[in-house]
């Protein structure tokens, strides 16, 4: 896989596919970025190209617009933050419409001097970006490619998507992987090749079905697989325990039984949970044994005994991969499981990887220093699919 050091970019236009998909708060007028982690992660690649006097054209998606412009998903606020981080102006090529690589983009790109940068409007405002129709994707890829002479893929959080800007544009331009993608791959290879032992994986999140592939892939490789979050209740049901009104995937119970039988004592479930009488921050709560959840109550976090037990396993591990919160951490009464696990992962002496997505958001929301972890991934879904052993379209396109 080529790197940007292999490209002769001085004086040339370089299209950089970054992942600037950040959360925005629209509640107080002008949109405000609430977590700029992905913007910051994109800077090293962009800066390296600017240092080589390239003309840099950054593109990204944000949110899930339906192939048409939606003002709330505009990348305009991201252009402002990117300019602050780079310390130079960022020319924004958005015109409020869906012609992402059209006249406005060509005008802005045409005015770039060496060492300057522009940002295109949200790629998903164009229906061709995510279209399942190969002709539509190819047509949009042609439009994007016409803006540049080189392509750099640096959107690790999107490499599992067969989207025009991710897997089609590299077929049309000399290309390389960006700094972020190479760093992410180095970390994931360390988790899959020969991880130092003991190797502990902590999985949370809502659904077993979302994590089934990675559970099956990791079970033979790990010394401990700790399961929390909403997905733990389907496992508890598989053991015959009542789960009240907790999140339950009934169709996955037999699968969970099989996984429990295969894993033996390597698959660790909570022994206590925090339950609530309703899904709300001000709900009545109680800590109960994991096999005694009352009828009508919802499990919304792992309990204090489970948090301590999970932390002990993590503290003794030489390699830790954590993906998914232990509870509804957005509500203070149900954040302690996630906080306890995050602090254990951060303070342990092992090689610690946070698998992106909600886990990375939790680290920042809970105020845990990011430098306390060996690596915080920018790609939740991409990380999981890589660990499953799947072929990721965006990586495959760069590796030719």
Curated annotation (Swiss-Prot):
GO biological process, one term: glycolytic process
UniProt xrefs under SUPFAM superfamilies: Phosphoglycerate kinase (SSF53748)
Residue numbers binding ATP: 211, 299, 330, 356-359
Keywords noted in UniProt: ATP-binding, Cytoplasm, Glycolysis, Kinase, Nucleotide-binding, Transferase
InterPro entries linked: Phosphoglycerate_kinase, Phosphoglycerate_kinase_CS, Phosphoglycerate_kinase_N, Phosphoglycerate_kinase_sf
Reactions the enzyme catalyzes: (2R)-3-phosphoglycerate + ATP = (2R)-3-phospho-glyceroyl phosphate + ADP
GO molecular function annotation: ADP binding; ATP binding; phosphoglycerate kinase activity
E.C. designation(s): 2.7.2.3
Nucleotide-binding keyword on record: yes
Keyword Glycoprotein: no
Pathway(s) this gene product operates in, as recorded in its UniProt entry: Carbohydrate degradation; glycolysis; pyruvate from D-glyceraldehyde 3-phosphate: step 2/5
PROSITE patterns associated with the record: PGLYCERATE_KINASE
Family: Belongs to the phosphoglycerate kinase family.
Protein name as annotated: Phosphoglycerate kinase
Protein source organism: Parafrankia sp. (strain EAN1pec)
Gene it is expressed from: pgk
